[in-house]
Amino acid sequence: MAAITNNPDKEKALGLVLNQIERNFGKGSIMRLGDAARMKVETISTGALTLDLALGGGLPMGRVVEIYGPESSGKTTLALHAIAEVQKAGGVAAFVDAEHALDPTYSAALGVDINNLLVAQPDTGESALEIVDQLVRSAAVDVVVIDSVAALVPRAEIEGEMGDTQVGLQARLMSKALRKIAGNIGKSGCVVIFLNQLRQKIGITYGSPEVTTGGTALKFYASVRLDIRRIQTLKKGSEGEYGIRAKVKVAKNKVAPPFRIAEFDIIFGQGISRMGCMLDLAEQSDVVLRKGAWYSYNGDNISQGRDNAVKYLEENPKIAETIEQQVREKLELGSLSFAISQGDGEEEE
C-alpha cells in the first residue's frame, strides 16, 4: 500500500473547504467526530429502573423511539412515565393524541404535570405529523409522544367512502414524514416516541405472524424499538387483580447492546412500581438478599414475601433511598439525569 504523507497544502485545502461548507450550510454542518461537544448520547429515564438498565441508561435524546405491543400491555403508561421524568427535570413535553383517548386523571396519577403538558388531538395523520415536525423544529420541546401510529389516518382515507380500498397510504405517509422529521430530531435533541399496535399477517406458516402498523419506515428510522408484553396479572387474595407484570424486550438499540429484557410491575391507577423495580435490581446486585421468602438488608430481615418487601420500602423512604444509591453504584446506572437545553445554549447539570 502506498504511503500517505501529511501535506501542508492538503491541510490548507481541507480547512478552506470546511469553512466553505459551514458558510453554505450553517455552523456544525460538518465537523471532526472528536470535535463534537458531547460524544455521549444523553438519556431520559423511562420511570422503570430495570428498563433503564436494559437500555444502557434510558431513552436516547435526539432519536426516534418505537414502543409496540398488544392491547393493554402498558405502552401508553410507559410513554407517560417518560413524559413525567422529562417534566421533573424541567423539560417540556407534548402528547399527540391521535386516538383521542388520553386520560388526564390517570396521567396526573403517574406524575405528569397535566397543566403544562402540550396536547394535540388532530383529525388526520397529515395534521398530526405536521404538528410533530413543527414541535421538533422549534427545538423547544424535549419529548413528543404520538399515540398511536395506527390512528394516523391519511386524509384521503377519511374523505373517501367506507368501502374504498386505499393501498399503502399510511405507509407512504409515515415514510415521507420520517424523512422530513429525522434530521431535525437529531439537531433539536428531542425524543420522539411513536406508540404502535400489532396486527396479524394472514397465511404465515413459519415465524411470527405479528407485524406493526404503518409500514417498515419506522423500523429503520427508530434508534430504539421496545416490544412490551403483559406476562402476568397481579392478584392479592380477596382484593382481586391490582396490576400486571410487564416484560419489555429491547428489539433494537443503536446506542447500546440490543436484545436485553426487563420486567416491572404496573399497578392499576398508579403506573410503574418504582419500588418494585428497585427491589428487583437490589436483589440482582446482592444489595438486598433473599433466602426463601425472606428479604434481608444489612443482615436484618425486612419482610417476608415480595409484596411486603415493596411495602416496607414505600414506608421507609430513607432506607429505600440508600438502597437505590447502592444499586446505582453497583450497576453503574448513574443519576440518569439529563441536560435540558436553555435558551442561551447553556446546559443544566
UniProtKB/Swiss-Prot annotation:
PROSITE patterns: RECA_1, RECA_2, RECA_3. ATP binds at residues 69-76. GO terms for cellular component: cytosol. Keywords: ATP-binding, Cytoplasm, DNA damage, DNA recombination, DNA repair, DNA-binding, Nucleotide-binding, SOS response. The keyword Cell membrane does not apply. It is found in: Cytoplasm. SUPFAM superfamilies: P-loop containing nucleoside triphosphate hydrolases, RecA protein, C-terminal domain. It comes from the Bacteria. One of its GO terms (molecular function) is single-stranded DNA binding. Belongs to the RecA family. Can catalyze the hydrolysis of ATP in the presence of single-stranded DNA, the ATP-dependent uptake of single-stranded DNA by duplex DNA, and the ATP-dependent hybridization of homologous single-stranded DNAs. It interacts with LexA causing its activation and leading to its autocatalytic cleavage. This is Protein RecA. It comes from Crocosphaera subtropica (strain ATCC 51142 / BH68). The lineage of its organism: Bacteria, Bacillati, Cyanobacteriota, Cyanophyceae, Oscillatoriophycideae.
